[in-house]
């Protein structure tokens, strides 16, 4: 029993109603959030003399305070619990690591509908198809669809300001509804109709229509139209050959496979829509030690379906790996309320659904094996680096790089690794300003000062700081970092990574602050770890630099024009569909932009022609 928390007087004040409780430690941090159908009964169970779970014993020993929120129903308690877990990320709760929403394919409600990818709340008018497991799957599908159904994918602002067809029309990837005479409204709507059926999984219906269309065109000697229909038919059949389709009805399912080994849990979700497997994703929730499989699975289930509920497409049936409990039955009610229709959990499925669940379970186990092998590789590399540098332990490393184009749009990056590999949620980019363009020393000094001059939690202090550069960069970095570490409990090792004359991987020179240089064999695991963190930092910096450079170049031409501030620049680019279209626009077209007078349009036109 906890010596910090006197449970007896507290439990006398607790009601038997449903609700949520928050447990705090001595530092006033929320360490656990739970819900209960009967608060008094649940909270009393924590303070029994014989607790059978080591996790519960550890939790109770750290309790200094408990707050209780009473709710009207168990469903309300479930939703409130989810919100609190998301807000506080308590130490003793199972936490969903990947809380991002899934992407969809979006068909707009425009007169000439646009096809695009979408992530987030479904606020725009139109139709949503999905979800897809990741943005790569959406891009691949959009690329495929363009070849079969040439529906436009350009922004509405670009579409409304075109006077001649773009490259997509020239290569047969768009029907060109933006220019009169290229395709009739009826012809475009026909393509959109086929596309809609295809995305709804009604491939055979599309094929029947296209076969009939091809035969009719042949009878009427319209051989070019017949050839187009034939090509579409062949493309759809190739897609069907590659896609596994259920022999059941065209149903929507989520199938949740589960596996847990060596302290790692994986829930693998197969997303099936209209009888087709759209894709899958493995989730690895963060679990406290000694957490039961039932708690892991139910906690994940709750967080997964209650997160982004406004954006997530919840199917009518969810196939589960485990049997139903009181908790899952309450969750089923809550999810149904959020979905606005009945959502049913199914266990022990047979037939095709049973095969789906077996596949999901196998994938979950395979994902754990892959993750364990990856962790083992990373762990071996950390140990090898530790031995090479003569360090007792390495738990955290950071690496910095600078990217610019001839001094333009300088961007610095910081990436973080721990013993499990890249900590991508802690990656950071820094816009570098107020320096002479191309001065990498000044850029490095600025990013290090911004990174380390503020108060750091002891767990965030790295054991090694890598600088992508030679002796000059390293010495400048040391000056800045050493001026910041007076209050740190440990001093990190600072190492420069010089690429050498040939800049070939495996020939890197490593430099210490003492000026010592050394090389590692090209097949050394320690070198592979250094290359990994260096490449991550380099790629992170380049991606940020290119985005910033593109943004700067889009607006820099307009910045020198009197009367054109940030809002008008944005309006011009948005309304006319980009810088290239703006440069082609006439004075009259520019003057149509909201907030742009005819006189200002004349000035803009003349400035862009210089």
UniProtKB/Swiss-Prot annotation:
Entry-linked SUPFAM superfamilies: C-terminal UvrC-binding domain of UvrB, GIY-YIG endonuclease, RuvA domain 2-like
A Pfam family matched in the record: HHH_5
CDD domains associated with the record: GIY-YIG_UvrC_Cho (cd10434)
Family annotation (InterPro entries): GIY-YIG_endonuc, GIY-YIG_endonuc_sf, GIY-YIG_UvrC_Cho, Hlx-hairpin-Hlx_DNA-bd_motif, RuvA_2-like, UVR_dom, UVR_dom_sf, UvrABC_protein_C
Compartments in which it is found: Cytoplasm
Similarity-based family: Belongs to the UvrC family.
Subunit: Interacts with UvrB in an incision complex.
Annotated protein name in UniProt: UvrABC system protein C
Species: Vibrio cholerae serotype O1 (strain ATCC 39315 / El Tor Inaba N16961)
Gene that encodes the chain: uvrC
């Amino acid at each position: 029993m906890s010596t910090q928390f006197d449970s007896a007087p507290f439990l006398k004040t607790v009601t038997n109603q449903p609700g949520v409780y928050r447990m705090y430690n001595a530092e006033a941090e929320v360490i656990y959030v739970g819900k209960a159908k009967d608060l008094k009964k649940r909270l009393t169970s924590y303070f029994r003399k014989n607790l059978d779970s080591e996790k519960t014993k550890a939790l109770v020993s750290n309790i200094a305070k408990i707050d209780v929120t009473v709710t009207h129903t168990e469903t309300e308690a479930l939703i409130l619990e989810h919100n609190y877990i998301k807000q506080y990320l308590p130490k003793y709760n199972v936490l969903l690591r990947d809380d991002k929403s899934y992407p969809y394919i979006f068909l707009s409600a425009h007169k000439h509908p646009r096809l695009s990818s979408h992530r987030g709340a479904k606020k725009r008018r139109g139709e949503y198809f999905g979800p897809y497991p990741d943005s790569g799957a959406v891009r691949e599908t959009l690329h495929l669809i363009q070849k079969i159904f040439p529906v436009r994918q350009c922004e509405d602002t670009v579409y409304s300001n075109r006077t001649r067809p773009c490259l997509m029309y020239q290569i047969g990837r768009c029907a060109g509804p933006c220019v009169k005479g290229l395709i009739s409204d009826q012809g475009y709507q026909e393509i959109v109709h086929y596309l809609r059926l295809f995305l709804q999984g009604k491939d055979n219906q599309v094929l029947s229509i296209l076969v009939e269309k091809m035969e009719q065109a042949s009878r009427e000697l319209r051989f070019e139209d017949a050839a187009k229909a034939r090509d579409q038919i062949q493309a759809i059949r190739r897609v069907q050959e590659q896609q596994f389709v259920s022999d059941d009805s065209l149903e929507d399912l989520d199938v949740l496979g589960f596996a847990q080994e060596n302290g790692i849990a994986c829930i693998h979700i197969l997303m099936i829509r209209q009888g087709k497997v759209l894709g899958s994703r493995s989730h690895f929730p963060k679990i406290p030690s000694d957490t039961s499989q039932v708690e892991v699975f139910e906690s994940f289930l709750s967080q997964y379906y209650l997160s982004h509920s406004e954006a997530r497409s919840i199917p009518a049936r969810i196939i589960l790996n485990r049997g139903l409990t009181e908790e899952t039955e309450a969750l089923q009610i809550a999810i149904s309320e959020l979905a606005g229709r009945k959502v049913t959990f199914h266990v022990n499925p047979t037939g095709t659904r049973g095969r789906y669940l077996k596949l999901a379970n196998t994938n979950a186990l395979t994902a754990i094996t892959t993750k364990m092998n990856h962790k083992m590789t990373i762990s071996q590399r950390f140990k090898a680096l530790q031995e090479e540098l003569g360090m007792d332990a390495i738990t955290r490393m950071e690496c910095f790089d600078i990217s610019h184009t001839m001094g333009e749009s300088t961007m610095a990056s910081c990436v973080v690794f721990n013993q499990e590999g890249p900590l991508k949620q802690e990656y950071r980019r820094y816009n570098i300003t107020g320096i002479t363009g191309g001065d990498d020393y000044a850029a490095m000094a600025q990013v290090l000062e911004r990174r380390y001059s503020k108060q750091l939690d002891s767990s965030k202090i790295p054991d090694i700081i890598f600088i992508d550069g030679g002796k000059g960069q390293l010495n400048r970095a040391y000056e800045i970092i050493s001026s910041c570490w007076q209050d740190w409990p440990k001093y990190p090792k600072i190492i420069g990574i010089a690429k050498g004359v040939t800049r070939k991987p495996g020939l890197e020179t490593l430099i210490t602050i003492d000026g010592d240089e050394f090389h590692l064999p090209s097949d050394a695991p320690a070198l592979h770890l250094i290359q990994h963190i260096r490449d991550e930092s380099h790629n992170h910096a380049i991606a940020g630099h290119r985005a910033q450079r593109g943004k700067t170049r889009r607006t820099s031409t307009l910045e020198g024009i009197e009367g054109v501030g940030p809002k008008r620049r944005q309006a011009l680019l948005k309304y006319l569909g980009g810088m290239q279209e703006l440069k082609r626009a006439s004075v009259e077209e520019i003057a149509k932009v909201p907030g742009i007078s005819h006189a200002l349009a004349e000035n803009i036109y003349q400035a862009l022609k210089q």
